Amino acid sequence: MARPAAGPGGISKFGNDFGLQRWRNTPRYDQTQPLEGSVCGYGLSNPFHESLFSCPAASWPQAKLGRPNTPQEPSKDLKRILSQISPKRIEATIRKLVSFGTRHTLSTQTNATHGIGAARDWIASEFQRYADASDGRLTVKVIGYEQQPDGSRVLFPVRISDVVATLKGSEDPERVYVVSGHYDSRASDPLDYKTDAPGANDDASGVAVSLEIARVMSQRNLPRPKATIVFAAVAGEEQGLLGSNFLAQTYRNSSTNVEGMFTNDIIGSSTADDGTKEPHVIRLFAQGVPPLNVENQAMREKRLMIGGENDTPARQLARFVKETAENKYTDMQVSVIYRLDRYLRGGDHRPFLEAGYPAARFTEPNENYAHQHQNIRIEKDPKTGKDIQYGDLPEFCDFDFISRVGKVNAAALWNLAMSPGMPRNVRVDTSDLSNDSKFTWDPPAGGNAGVGGYEIVWRSTIAPFWTNVMDVGMVQAATIDLSKDNVIFGIRARGKNGERGVAVLPFP
Protein backbone atom coordinates (compact mmCIF):
# COMPACT_ATOMS: atom_id res chain seq x y z
CA MET A 1 0.00 0.00 0.00
CA ALA A 2 1.38 3.41 -0.93
CA ARG A 3 1.60 6.08 1.71
CA PRO A 4 -1.39 8.46 1.76
CA ALA A 5 -0.95 11.74 -0.05
CA ALA A 6 -0.77 14.92 1.94
CA GLY A 7 -3.25 17.71 1.57
CA PRO A 8 -2.65 21.46 1.82
CA GLY A 9 0.05 22.42 4.28
CA GLY A 10 1.21 18.83 4.49
CA ILE A 11 -1.86 17.70 6.46
CA SER A 12 -2.66 14.08 5.77
CA LYS A 13 -5.83 13.35 3.83
CA PHE A 14 -6.84 11.25 6.80
CA GLY A 15 -8.05 14.49 8.42
CA ASN A 16 -7.08 17.30 10.72
CA ASP A 17 -6.50 14.90 13.60
CA PHE A 18 -3.50 13.77 11.51
CA GLY A 19 -5.30 10.52 10.85
CA LEU A 20 -4.03 8.83 14.00
CA GLN A 21 -7.07 6.67 14.62
CA ARG A 22 -7.81 6.06 10.97
CA TRP A 23 -4.18 5.17 10.31
CA ARG A 24 -4.42 2.42 12.87
CA ASN A 25 -7.55 1.07 11.24
CA THR A 26 -6.27 1.00 7.66
CA PRO A 27 -4.01 -1.62 6.04
CA ARG A 28 -0.34 -1.04 6.69
CA TYR A 29 2.05 -0.07 3.93
CA ASP A 30 4.30 -2.87 2.70
CA GLN A 31 6.53 -3.48 5.71
CA THR A 32 8.41 -6.34 4.12
CA GLN A 33 10.57 -3.83 2.21
CA PRO A 34 12.94 -1.19 3.56
CA LEU A 35 11.55 2.32 3.60
CA GLU A 36 12.52 4.54 0.69
CA GLY A 37 13.06 8.16 1.59
CA SER A 38 12.51 9.79 4.93
CA VAL A 39 11.06 12.82 6.59
CA CYS A 40 13.67 15.37 7.67
CA GLY A 41 16.17 12.53 7.49
CA TYR A 42 14.48 10.67 10.34
CA GLY A 43 13.07 7.73 8.38
CA LEU A 44 9.57 8.51 9.66
CA SER A 45 6.69 6.80 7.92
CA ASN A 46 3.49 7.74 9.72
CA PRO A 47 1.35 10.51 8.16
CA PHE A 48 1.15 12.17 11.59
CA HIS A 49 4.92 12.55 11.56
CA GLU A 50 4.92 13.70 7.95
CA SER A 51 2.44 16.41 8.86
CA LEU A 52 4.31 17.44 11.98
CA PHE A 53 7.71 17.79 10.33
CA SER A 54 6.46 19.40 7.13
CA CYS A 55 4.80 22.33 8.90
CA PRO A 56 6.63 25.67 8.49
CA ALA A 57 7.45 26.01 12.20
CA ALA A 58 9.37 22.73 12.25
CA SER A 59 12.48 24.23 10.64
CA TRP A 60 12.69 27.34 12.85
CA PRO A 61 15.14 28.78 13.64
CA GLN A 62 16.68 28.66 10.18
CA ALA A 63 20.43 28.84 10.66
CA LYS A 64 22.48 30.65 8.02
CA LEU A 65 25.68 28.96 9.07
CA GLY A 66 27.06 25.46 9.05
CA ARG A 67 25.66 22.72 6.84
CA PRO A 68 23.09 19.93 7.09
CA ASN A 69 24.15 17.03 9.28
CA THR A 70 24.20 13.95 7.05
CA PRO A 71 24.62 10.24 7.82
CA GLN A 72 28.15 8.92 8.02
CA GLU A 73 29.16 6.78 5.05
CA PRO A 74 30.65 3.39 5.99
CA SER A 75 34.38 3.07 5.43
CA LYS A 76 35.88 0.49 3.09
CA ASP A 77 36.85 -1.70 6.04
CA LEU A 78 33.38 -1.48 7.55
CA LYS A 79 31.80 -2.51 4.26
CA ARG A 80 34.03 -5.59 4.29
CA ILE A 81 32.92 -6.38 7.83
CA LEU A 82 29.24 -6.04 7.02
CA SER A 83 29.54 -8.22 3.93
CA GLN A 84 30.92 -11.11 6.00
CA ILE A 85 28.24 -11.35 8.68
CA SER A 86 26.65 -14.71 7.96
CA PRO A 87 23.01 -15.74 8.55
CA LYS A 88 24.08 -19.39 8.31
CA ARG A 89 26.65 -19.02 11.09
CA ILE A 90 24.12 -17.19 13.23
CA GLU A 91 21.60 -19.98 12.66
CA ALA A 92 24.18 -22.63 13.57
CA THR A 93 24.99 -20.81 16.82
CA ILE A 94 21.35 -20.51 17.81
CA ARG A 95 20.62 -24.17 17.08
CA LYS A 96 23.68 -25.25 19.03
CA LEU A 97 22.62 -23.24 22.08
CA VAL A 98 19.11 -24.67 21.85
CA SER A 99 20.59 -28.19 21.82
CA PHE A 100 21.65 -27.85 25.46
CA GLY A 101 18.02 -28.36 26.53
CA THR A 102 17.76 -25.71 29.20
CA ARG A 103 20.21 -22.90 29.88
CA HIS A 104 18.50 -21.86 33.09
CA THR A 105 20.92 -20.15 35.45
CA LEU A 106 20.21 -22.77 38.13
CA SER A 107 20.61 -25.74 35.78
CA THR A 108 23.58 -28.11 35.86
CA GLN A 109 27.07 -26.76 35.29
CA THR A 110 28.82 -30.14 35.26
CA ASN A 111 27.08 -31.95 32.40
CA ALA A 112 29.03 -31.72 29.13
CA THR A 113 25.96 -31.69 26.87
CA HIS A 114 23.08 -30.30 28.93
CA GLY A 115 22.48 -27.17 30.96
CA ILE A 116 24.01 -23.76 31.34
CA GLY A 117 27.50 -25.04 32.09
CA ALA A 118 27.69 -26.83 28.76
CA ALA A 119 26.46 -23.69 27.00
CA ARG A 120 29.05 -21.55 28.80
CA ASP A 121 31.88 -23.88 27.85
CA TRP A 122 30.80 -24.05 24.22
CA ILE A 123 30.55 -20.25 23.92
CA ALA A 124 34.00 -19.88 25.47
CA SER A 125 35.43 -22.45 23.04
CA GLU A 126 33.92 -20.59 20.07
CA PHE A 127 35.37 -17.27 21.18
CA GLN A 128 38.70 -19.01 21.75
CA ARG A 129 38.58 -20.48 18.24
CA TYR A 130 38.26 -16.96 16.85
CA ALA A 131 41.03 -15.78 19.16
CA ASP A 132 43.37 -18.52 17.95
CA ALA A 133 42.86 -17.32 14.38
CA SER A 134 43.29 -13.64 15.26
CA ASP A 135 47.08 -13.52 15.68
CA GLY A 136 46.72 -12.37 19.28
CA ARG A 137 44.17 -9.63 18.64
CA LEU A 138 41.32 -11.29 20.53
CA THR A 139 41.61 -12.59 24.10
CA VAL A 140 39.01 -14.62 25.99
CA LYS A 141 38.18 -14.89 29.69
CA VAL A 142 35.42 -16.49 31.73
CA ILE A 143 34.77 -14.35 34.78
CA GLY A 144 32.18 -14.71 37.50
CA TYR A 145 31.17 -14.92 41.13
CA GLU A 146 29.11 -17.00 43.56
CA GLN A 147 25.54 -15.72 43.79
CA GLN A 148 23.83 -16.48 47.09
CA PRO A 149 20.10 -17.25 47.45
CA ASP A 150 18.09 -14.05 47.21
CA GLY A 151 14.65 -15.18 48.38
CA SER A 152 13.29 -14.54 44.92
CA ARG A 153 14.72 -16.14 41.77
CA VAL A 154 17.90 -17.71 43.14
CA LEU A 155 17.04 -20.79 45.20
CA PHE A 156 20.54 -21.91 46.15
CA PRO A 157 24.15 -20.75 45.74
CA VAL A 158 25.14 -20.73 42.08
CA ARG A 159 28.10 -19.69 39.98
CA ILE A 160 27.32 -16.81 37.60
CA SER A 161 29.75 -16.82 34.67
CA ASP A 162 30.28 -14.25 31.93
CA VAL A 163 32.23 -15.14 28.80
CA VAL A 164 34.16 -12.06 27.67
CA ALA A 165 36.18 -11.68 24.46
CA THR A 166 38.25 -8.50 24.14
CA LEU A 167 39.52 -6.98 20.89
CA LYS A 168 42.09 -4.50 22.18
CA GLY A 169 42.30 -1.12 20.51
CA SER A 170 45.43 -0.04 18.66
CA GLU A 171 45.56 3.68 19.56
CA ASP A 172 43.14 4.33 22.44
CA PRO A 173 42.83 0.93 24.16
CA GLU A 174 41.61 2.39 27.45
CA ARG A 175 38.37 3.50 25.74
CA VAL A 176 35.97 0.54 25.68
CA TYR A 177 32.73 -0.40 23.92
CA VAL A 178 30.73 -3.46 24.95
CA VAL A 179 28.18 -5.58 23.09
CA SER A 180 26.37 -8.42 24.87
CA GLY A 181 23.67 -11.04 24.74
CA HIS A 182 22.57 -13.31 27.59
CA TYR A 183 23.00 -17.04 27.22
CA ASP A 184 20.70 -18.17 30.02
CA SER A 185 17.09 -19.12 29.24
CA ARG A 186 13.86 -19.87 31.10
CA ALA A 187 10.55 -21.70 30.78
CA SER A 188 7.14 -20.48 31.97
CA ASP A 189 8.10 -20.72 35.64
CA PRO A 190 11.20 -18.59 36.29
CA LEU A 191 12.27 -21.06 39.00
CA ASP A 192 11.92 -24.17 36.81
CA TYR A 193 15.49 -25.15 36.01
CA LYS A 194 14.74 -28.67 34.73
CA THR A 195 12.20 -28.21 31.92
CA ASP A 196 13.68 -27.62 28.47
CA ALA A 197 13.89 -23.91 27.71
CA PRO A 198 15.29 -23.50 24.17
CA GLY A 199 15.62 -19.70 24.34
CA ALA A 200 16.25 -19.38 20.61
CA ASN A 201 15.13 -15.77 20.41
CA ASP A 202 15.57 -14.91 24.10
CA ASP A 203 18.47 -14.78 23.93
CA ALA A 204 20.49 -17.14 21.78
CA SER A 205 19.92 -14.56 19.04
CA GLY A 206 21.81 -11.90 20.98
CA VAL A 207 24.66 -14.26 21.84
CA ALA A 208 24.90 -15.26 18.18
CA VAL A 209 25.37 -11.60 17.21
CA SER A 210 28.17 -11.12 19.76
CA LEU A 211 29.93 -14.25 18.49
CA GLU A 212 29.53 -13.41 14.82
CA ILE A 213 30.77 -9.83 15.11
CA ALA A 214 33.74 -11.03 17.17
CA ARG A 215 34.58 -13.59 14.48
CA VAL A 216 34.54 -11.05 11.69
CA MET A 217 36.19 -8.09 13.42
CA SER A 218 39.06 -10.11 14.90
CA GLN A 219 40.32 -11.34 11.53
CA ARG A 220 43.98 -10.64 10.76
CA ASN A 221 43.22 -9.09 7.38
CA LEU A 222 41.37 -6.18 9.01
CA PRO A 223 42.95 -3.26 10.85
CA ARG A 224 42.56 -3.21 14.60
CA PRO A 225 39.91 -0.83 15.88
CA LYS A 226 41.44 2.24 17.51
CA ALA A 227 39.45 1.73 20.72
CA THR A 228 38.72 -1.57 22.46
CA ILE A 229 35.61 -3.63 21.68
CA VAL A 230 34.34 -6.24 24.14
CA PHE A 231 32.03 -9.06 23.03
CA ALA A 232 30.20 -10.65 25.95
CA ALA A 233 27.81 -13.48 26.68
CA VAL A 234 26.38 -13.03 30.16
CA ALA A 235 24.36 -15.28 32.47
CA GLY A 236 21.67 -14.69 35.07
CA GLU A 237 19.62 -12.19 33.05
CA GLU A 238 16.36 -14.00 33.73
CA GLN A 239 17.15 -14.16 37.45
CA GLY A 240 17.73 -10.42 37.78
CA LEU A 241 20.39 -9.13 35.33
CA LEU A 242 23.03 -10.80 37.49
CA GLY A 243 25.81 -11.41 34.98
CA SER A 244 25.49 -8.00 33.39
CA ASN A 245 25.54 -6.32 36.77
CA PHE A 246 28.72 -8.19 37.65
CA LEU A 247 30.35 -7.15 34.38
CA ALA A 248 29.31 -3.51 34.73
CA GLN A 249 30.53 -3.34 38.33
CA THR A 250 33.80 -5.03 37.35
CA TYR A 251 34.43 -2.24 34.87
CA ARG A 252 33.31 0.44 37.30
CA ASN A 253 35.50 -0.88 40.12
CA SER A 254 38.53 -0.78 37.82
CA SER A 255 37.61 2.74 36.58
CA THR A 256 37.32 1.45 33.02
CA ASN A 257 36.27 4.11 30.52
CA VAL A 258 33.26 2.40 28.92
CA GLU A 259 31.88 4.97 26.47
CA GLY A 260 29.10 2.79 25.06
CA MET A 261 27.32 -0.51 25.65
CA PHE A 262 24.69 -2.35 23.62
CA THR A 263 22.68 -5.36 24.65
CA ASN A 264 20.93 -7.45 22.02
CA ASP A 265 17.98 -9.17 23.65
CA ILE A 266 15.11 -10.71 21.68
CA ILE A 267 16.33 -9.78 18.21
CA GLY A 268 15.31 -13.04 16.54
CA SER A 269 12.17 -12.20 14.58
CA SER A 270 10.31 -9.27 13.07
CA THR A 271 6.92 -11.01 13.07
CA ALA A 272 4.19 -10.03 15.54
CA ASP A 273 1.53 -12.36 16.91
CA ASP A 274 -0.92 -11.04 14.29
CA GLY A 275 1.47 -11.89 11.45
CA THR A 276 2.67 -8.33 10.88
CA LYS A 277 6.22 -8.31 9.51
CA GLU A 278 8.77 -5.51 9.70
CA PRO A 279 11.99 -7.27 8.66
CA HIS A 280 13.96 -4.08 8.05
CA VAL A 281 13.31 -2.34 11.39
CA ILE A 282 15.07 -2.76 14.73
CA ARG A 283 14.13 -0.92 17.92
CA LEU A 284 16.80 0.77 20.03
CA PHE A 285 15.73 1.72 23.56
CA ALA A 286 17.58 4.67 25.10
CA GLN A 287 17.02 5.97 28.63
CA GLY A 288 16.27 9.59 29.44
CA VAL A 289 17.25 11.21 32.75
CA PRO A 290 19.96 9.11 34.45
CA PRO A 291 19.33 7.54 37.87
CA LEU A 292 20.21 9.65 40.91
CA ASN A 293 23.16 7.45 41.83
CA VAL A 294 24.74 8.55 38.53
CA GLU A 295 23.61 12.17 38.31
CA ASN A 296 22.95 13.93 41.62
CA GLN A 297 19.92 16.08 42.35
CA ALA A 298 21.71 19.35 41.60
CA MET A 299 22.86 18.06 38.23
CA ARG A 300 19.40 16.72 37.48
CA GLU A 301 17.81 20.08 38.27
CA LYS A 302 20.30 21.81 35.98
CA ARG A 303 19.55 19.30 33.21
CA LEU A 304 15.83 19.92 33.53
CA MET A 305 16.34 23.69 33.66
CA ILE A 306 18.19 23.75 30.32
CA GLY A 307 15.88 21.22 28.66
CA GLY A 308 18.52 18.52 28.50
CA GLU A 309 16.37 15.58 29.55
CA ASN A 310 16.45 14.27 25.96
CA ASP A 311 20.22 14.61 25.65
CA THR A 312 21.57 12.10 28.12
CA PRO A 313 24.64 10.03 27.20
CA ALA A 314 22.41 7.05 26.34
CA ARG A 315 20.35 9.10 23.90
CA GLN A 316 23.43 10.64 22.33
CA LEU A 317 24.67 7.09 21.81
CA ALA A 318 21.36 6.18 20.15
CA ARG A 319 21.60 9.21 17.85
CA PHE A 320 25.05 8.05 16.84
CA VAL A 321 23.67 4.61 15.94
CA LYS A 322 20.92 6.18 13.85
CA GLU A 323 23.49 8.28 12.01
CA THR A 324 26.01 5.51 11.32
CA ALA A 325 24.08 2.24 11.10
CA GLU A 326 21.00 3.06 9.04
CA ASN A 327 22.08 2.66 5.43
CA LYS A 328 21.90 0.41 2.38
CA TYR A 329 24.72 -1.78 3.68
CA THR A 330 22.82 -2.76 6.83
CA ASP A 331 19.47 -2.61 5.00
CA MET A 332 17.84 -1.58 8.26
CA GLN A 333 15.91 1.29 9.81
CA VAL A 334 16.85 2.01 13.42
CA SER A 335 13.73 3.01 15.34
CA VAL A 336 15.02 4.86 18.40
CA ILE A 337 12.63 4.58 21.35
CA TYR A 338 13.14 7.26 23.97
CA ARG A 339 12.63 5.15 27.09
CA LEU A 340 14.63 2.70 29.19
CA ASP A 341 12.84 -0.43 27.99
CA ARG A 342 9.44 -1.91 27.17
CA TYR A 343 6.76 -1.90 29.84
CA LEU A 344 7.18 -4.63 32.49
CA ARG A 345 10.54 -5.70 31.02
CA GLY A 346 14.20 -5.19 31.79
CA GLY A 347 17.52 -5.78 30.08
CA ASP A 348 21.26 -6.05 30.53
CA HIS A 349 21.87 -2.44 29.52
CA ARG A 350 20.34 -1.29 32.80
CA PRO A 351 23.24 -2.29 35.10
CA PHE A 352 25.61 -0.38 32.82
CA LEU A 353 23.39 2.69 32.99
CA GLU A 354 23.32 2.38 36.78
CA ALA A 355 27.11 2.14 36.77
CA GLY A 356 27.23 5.48 34.92
CA TYR A 357 27.90 4.17 31.42
CA PRO A 358 25.98 5.08 28.23
CA ALA A 359 23.99 2.00 27.22
CA ALA A 360 21.04 1.04 25.02
CA ARG A 361 19.02 -2.04 24.09
CA PHE A 362 18.30 -3.54 20.67
CA THR A 363 15.00 -5.46 20.44
CA GLU A 364 12.92 -6.69 17.52
CA PRO A 365 10.10 -4.38 16.30
CA ASN A 366 7.25 -6.78 17.08
CA GLU A 367 7.09 -9.39 19.80
CA ASN A 368 5.14 -12.63 20.00
CA TYR A 369 4.70 -13.50 23.66
CA ALA A 370 3.70 -17.08 22.85
CA HIS A 371 7.37 -17.51 21.93
CA GLN A 372 8.88 -15.96 25.06
CA HIS A 373 9.16 -17.47 28.55
CA GLN A 374 6.85 -20.36 27.62
CA ASN A 375 6.96 -24.11 28.11
CA ILE A 376 6.93 -25.92 24.76
CA ARG A 377 3.33 -26.98 24.12
CA ILE A 378 0.38 -26.67 21.76
CA GLU A 379 -2.90 -25.14 22.91
CA LYS A 380 -6.12 -24.16 21.21
CA ASP A 381 -6.78 -20.48 20.67
CA PRO A 382 -10.07 -19.86 22.53
CA LYS A 383 -11.10 -17.28 19.92
CA THR A 384 -10.29 -19.11 16.70
CA GLY A 385 -10.01 -22.73 17.75
CA LYS A 386 -6.67 -22.99 15.94
CA ASP A 387 -3.63 -24.64 17.45
CA ILE A 388 -1.00 -22.31 18.89
CA GLN A 389 2.57 -23.51 19.22
CA TYR A 390 4.13 -22.12 22.39
CA GLY A 391 7.83 -22.02 23.11
CA ASP A 392 10.94 -20.09 22.09
CA LEU A 393 11.91 -22.38 19.22
CA PRO A 394 14.40 -21.87 16.35
CA GLU A 395 11.61 -22.31 13.81
CA PHE A 396 10.28 -18.90 14.80
CA CYS A 397 13.61 -17.12 14.19
CA ASP A 398 14.40 -15.17 11.03
CA PHE A 399 18.13 -15.67 10.59
CA ASP A 400 18.44 -13.13 7.78
CA PHE A 401 16.81 -10.55 10.05
CA ILE A 402 19.20 -11.38 12.89
CA SER A 403 22.17 -10.98 10.55
CA ARG A 404 20.93 -7.51 9.57
CA VAL A 405 20.64 -6.61 13.26
CA GLY A 406 24.20 -7.86 13.60
CA LYS A 407 25.22 -5.49 10.82
CA VAL A 408 23.60 -2.57 12.66
CA ASN A 409 25.62 -3.48 15.76
CA ALA A 410 28.80 -3.91 13.76
CA ALA A 411 28.37 -0.57 12.01
CA ALA A 412 27.79 1.25 15.28
CA LEU A 413 30.64 -0.47 17.13
CA TRP A 414 33.19 -0.04 14.34
CA ASN A 415 32.37 3.63 13.88
CA LEU A 416 32.54 4.19 17.63
CA ALA A 417 35.88 2.43 17.93
CA MET A 418 37.40 4.18 14.89
CA SER A 419 36.28 7.70 15.86
CA PRO A 420 37.56 9.83 18.76
CA GLY A 421 36.02 9.55 22.19
CA MET A 422 33.61 12.04 23.70
CA PRO A 423 34.89 15.54 24.57
CA ARG A 424 35.06 16.21 28.32
CA ASN A 425 33.86 19.12 30.45
CA VAL A 426 31.70 20.54 27.67
CA ARG A 427 30.37 23.92 28.77
CA VAL A 428 28.17 26.72 27.46
CA ASP A 429 28.79 30.25 28.74
CA THR A 430 25.80 31.74 30.58
CA SER A 431 27.66 34.54 32.35
CA ASP A 432 25.62 37.22 30.57
CA LEU A 433 22.67 37.68 28.22
CA SER A 434 23.58 37.32 24.55
CA ASN A 435 22.14 36.09 21.27
CA ASP A 436 25.18 34.03 20.40
CA SER A 437 26.48 30.86 22.06
CA LYS A 438 29.96 30.38 23.50
CA PHE A 439 31.35 26.92 24.21
CA THR A 440 34.45 25.41 25.79
CA TRP A 441 35.53 21.79 26.13
CA ASP A 442 38.44 19.51 26.93
CA PRO A 443 39.79 16.74 24.70
CA PRO A 444 38.50 13.17 25.03
CA ALA A 445 39.95 11.01 27.80
CA GLY A 446 42.50 9.62 25.36
CA GLY A 447 43.73 13.10 24.42
CA ASN A 448 43.92 14.90 21.09
CA ALA A 449 46.26 12.43 19.35
CA GLY A 450 43.59 11.00 17.06
CA VAL A 451 41.47 14.13 16.81
CA GLY A 452 41.37 16.05 13.54
CA GLY A 453 39.03 18.77 14.76
CA TYR A 454 35.79 19.48 16.56
CA GLU A 455 32.24 20.07 15.39
CA ILE A 456 29.24 21.84 16.88
CA VAL A 457 25.94 20.15 16.07
CA TRP A 458 22.44 21.39 16.77
CA ARG A 459 18.76 20.79 16.20
CA SER A 460 15.49 22.45 17.10
CA THR A 461 14.24 21.57 20.57
CA ILE A 462 11.48 19.34 19.15
CA ALA A 463 13.69 17.47 16.67
CA PRO A 464 14.86 13.98 17.72
CA PHE A 465 18.18 13.94 15.81
CA TRP A 466 20.94 16.39 14.91
CA THR A 467 20.09 18.43 11.82
CA ASN A 468 22.98 20.92 11.47
CA VAL A 469 26.72 20.89 11.96
CA MET A 470 29.59 23.39 11.90
CA ASP A 471 33.27 22.44 11.77
CA VAL A 472 35.18 24.72 14.15
CA GLY A 473 38.63 23.19 13.69
CA MET A 474 41.27 22.07 16.14
CA VAL A 475 40.18 24.33 19.00
CA GLN A 476 38.71 23.92 22.47
CA ALA A 477 36.52 27.02 22.46
CA ALA A 478 34.15 28.46 19.89
CA THR A 479 31.38 31.03 19.54
CA ILE A 480 28.48 30.48 17.17
CA ASP A 481 26.02 33.13 15.99
CA LEU A 482 22.94 31.21 17.06
CA SER A 483 21.05 31.61 20.32
CA LYS A 484 21.39 28.82 22.87
CA ASP A 485 17.80 29.62 23.89
CA ASN A 486 16.34 28.33 20.63
CA VAL A 487 18.14 25.07 19.84
CA ILE A 488 19.87 22.10 21.46
CA PHE A 489 23.63 22.03 20.93
CA GLY A 490 26.21 19.27 21.09
CA ILE A 491 30.00 19.13 20.74
CA ARG A 492 31.71 16.17 19.09
CA ALA A 493 35.24 15.27 18.02
CA ARG A 494 36.13 14.36 14.46
CA GLY A 495 38.97 11.98 13.75
CA LYS A 496 41.82 12.57 11.35
CA ASN A 497 40.18 9.85 9.27
CA GLY A 498 36.97 11.90 9.11
CA GLU A 499 35.04 9.64 11.49
CA ARG A 500 32.71 11.63 13.73
CA GLY A 501 32.29 10.75 17.39
CA VAL A 502 29.39 10.92 19.82
CA ALA A 503 28.14 14.41 20.66
CA VAL A 504 28.00 15.77 24.21
CA LEU A 505 25.42 18.22 25.56
CA PRO A 506 27.03 21.41 26.97
CA PHE A 507 26.07 22.39 30.52
CA PRO A 508 26.30 25.89 32.01
From Swiss-Prot:
It is an enzyme of class 3 (hydrolase). Zn(2+) 1 binds at residues 182, 202, 265. Residues 422-508 form the Fibronectin type-III domain. One of its GO terms (cellular component) is extracellular region. Its cofactor is Zn(2+). The keyword NAD does not apply. Keywords: Glycoprotein, Hydrolase, Metal-binding, Metalloprotease, Protease, Secreted, Signal, Zinc. Zn(2+) 2 binds at residues 202, 238. It is found in: Secreted. InterPro entries: FN3_dom, FN3_sf, M28_fam, Peptidase_M28. Its EC number is 3.4.-.-. CDD domains: FN3 (cd00063), M28_like (cd05642). GO terms for biological process: proteolysis. Pfam families: Peptidase_M28. Gene3D superfamilies: Zn peptidases. Binds 2 Zn(2+) ions per subunit. Its main location: secreted. Glycans are attached at residues 111, 253, 435. One of its GO terms (molecular function) is metal ion binding. PANTHER family: METALLOPEPTIDASE M28 FAMILY MEMBER, PEPTIDASE M28 DOMAIN-CONTAINING PROTEIN. Belongs to the peptidase M28 family. M28B subfamily. This is Probable zinc metalloprotease MCYG_04217. It comes from Arthroderma otae (strain ATCC MYA-4605 / CBS 113480) (Microsporum canis). The lineage of its organism: Eukaryota, Fungi, Dikarya, Ascomycota, Pezizomycotina.
